[in-house]
């Protein structure tokens, strides 16, 4: 049985982790969301989230976006390549309902799976 937990090891925690991804990212995006990815040597994917107050004014909206993004990652973690991902949100993401946001994330995860070099 596959575990679908979201432990600390699956998160980007320090600024150096984020900088690593920003240096040479593979990009996949929609008008509202961009997911940057870079291969890691850990054998499992990790995720970091950036939801700027500039783009999403209200805290409860930022929290909803982060919660749905973490849940999408948690459910897809075993299908994803061993990459570090940074999810960047843009203006207009707060206007997406939960279903549209989840579908956009699934589309971007599939795109990263196709772009990743076979290992």
From Swiss-Prot:
Pfam families cross-referenced by the UniProt entry: Ribonuclease_P
SUPFAM superfamilies: Ribosomal protein S5 domain 2-like (SSF54211)
Enzyme class: hydrolase
Enzyme Commission number: 3.1.26.5
GO cellular component: ribonuclease P complex
GO molecular function: 3'-tRNA processing endoribonuclease activity; ribonuclease P activity; tRNA binding
Entry keyword set: Endonuclease, Hydrolase, Nuclease, RNA-binding, tRNA processing
Catalytic function, reaction form: Endonucleolytic cleavage of RNA, removing 5'-extranucleotides from tRNA precursor
Gene3D superfamilies: 3.30.230.10
One GO term (biological process): tRNA 3'-end processing
Similarity remark: Belongs to the RnpA family.
Record's subunit section: Consists of a catalytic RNA component (M1 or rnpB) and a protein subunit.
Function per UniProt: RNaseP catalyzes the removal of the 5'-leader sequence from pre-tRNA to produce the mature 5'-terminus. It can also cleave other RNA substrates such as 4.5S RNA. The protein component plays an auxiliary but essential role in vivo by binding to the 5'-leader sequence and broadening the substrate specificity of the ribozyme.
Protein name, entry field: Ribonuclease P protein component
Organism (species): Yersinia pestis
Gene: rnpA
